[in-house]
């Protein structure tokens, strides 16, 4: 059985170092897709690079935890900025869902304005779209527009509640992260997916060159390690040996 493998690099537009790392991992490695933060400091730079790479799938990385929102969000921001207090608000069930739905639409339009096309798919920074209160908003938004959505099926409370016309991969992994950034880890993810009989798999990654913006991230130097592993010739060969076909969310 032919299996589609999407290696998606998150955080396109976060910084020039992040952008260059993603492009390097695409041109000389196994990355096939990326998702962009439309409020990132280097989003225009990301769009410029993407025009030179028409085969690179570019989706939207919905942001509710970093930087300034595209719309006014008085119920979620502090001093005009987004932040990680969203987790506490989710636990307290005080999320401003109307604001979030409006911000999603505004970020989507901002993506189209910057990139000149619709995103191939949607996911989110820090997986906030998987919050139980937010997921239905994003899932129906994606289904209405006919674009794919990253779904961690182990997190979805009830798969029967998913829109019938929502597109996604059968498998998703965020395990290629932190201390587990090795070729062996990457291949274990593929083998586990194949064992489950999944015809499509997305592996999340964050390859980057370190710059001043990336240095401010709690997840900094491991991005360099990711880049090294993702551009290794042996990994590309091992993926091919396992019968995976590189693809993007347009193949789902």
Curated annotation (Swiss-Prot):
It comes from Salmonella dublin (strain CT_02021853). Pfam families: YdjC (PF04794). GO terms for cellular component: cytoplasm. SUPFAM superfamilies: Glycoside hydrolase/deacetylase. The keyword Cytoplasm applies. It is an enzyme of class 3 (hydrolase). CDD domains: YdjC_EF3048_like. This is Chitooligosaccharide deacetylase. It is found in: Cytoplasm. Homodimer.
């Amino acid at each position: 059985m032919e299996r589609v493998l999407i290696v998606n690099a998150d955080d396109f537009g976060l910084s020039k170092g992040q952008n260059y790392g993603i492009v390097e991992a695409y041109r000389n490695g196994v990355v096939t897709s990326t998702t962009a933060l439309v409020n990132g400091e280097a989003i225009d730079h990301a769009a410029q690079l993407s025009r030179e790479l028409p085969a690179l799938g570019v989706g939207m990385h919905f942001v509710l935890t970093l930087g300034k929102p595209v719309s006014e969000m008085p119920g979620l921001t502090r001093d005009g900025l987004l932040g990680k207090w969203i987790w506490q608000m989710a636990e307290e069930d005080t999320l401003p869902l109307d604001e979030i739905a409006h911000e999603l639409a505004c970020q989507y339009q901002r993506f189209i304005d910057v990139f000149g096309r619709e995103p191939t798919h949607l996911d989110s920074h820090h997986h906030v779209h998987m919050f139980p209160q937010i997921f239905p908003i994003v899932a129906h938004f994606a289904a209405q527009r006919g674009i794919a959505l990253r779904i961690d099926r182990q997190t979805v409370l009830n798969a029967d509640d998913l829109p019938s016309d929502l597109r996604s991969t059968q498998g998703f992994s965020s395990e290629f992260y932190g201390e587990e950034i090795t070729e062996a880890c990457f291949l274990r993810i593929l083998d586990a997916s194949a064992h489950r009989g999944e015809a499509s798999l997305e592996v999340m990654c964050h390859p980057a060159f370190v710059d001043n913006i990336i240095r401010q991230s709690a997840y900094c130097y491991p991005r360099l390690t990711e880049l090294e592993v993702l551009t290794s010739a042996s990994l590309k060969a091992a993926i091919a040996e396992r019968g995976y076909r590189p693809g993007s969310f347009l193949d789902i």
